[in-house]
Amino acid sequence: MKRVLVKGIQGYQRFISPLKPPTCRFYPSCSHYGIEAIEKHGAVKGSYLTARRLIRCQPFHPGGLDYVPDTFDWKAPLQREKPESQRDD
């Protein structure tokens, strides 16, 4: 299952993404995040993390650095802590 999901994302990166202007608000891009999440946490958990990321990738979210977490938590909030470059301190 992991292989099918990763190949689907790679197909998007190769054939669809070049036809669109870059719009991802995050680094790494959502498609790279999806591949890493699926490879690191498996098909179900990786897909869940990818879906959460895609929900946040919209004009009303500031974006920024958002790496795949090393540990998985179903209850983790949708909004992670802001990167240091975006803190108001």
Curated annotation (Swiss-Prot):
Q: Where in the cell is it found?
A: Cell membrane
Q: Does the keyword Nucleotide-binding apply?
A: no
Indicate whether Glycoprotein appears among the record's keywords: no
The record's InterPro entries line, in alphabetical order, gives:
Membr_insert_effic_factor_YidD
Entry GO CC = plasma membrane
Pfam families (UniProt xref): YidD
Chief localisation class: membrane
The way it spans or sits in the membrane comes to:
Peripheral membrane protein
Q: Tell me which UniProt keywords the record has, alphabetically.
A: Cell membrane, Membrane
Provide the family line.
Answer: Belongs to the UPF0161 family.
Task: Name the HAMAP family for this protein.
Answer: UPF0161_YidD
The record's function comment reads: Could be involved in insertion of integral membrane proteins into the membrane.
Protein name, as recorded: Putative membrane protein insertion efficiency factor
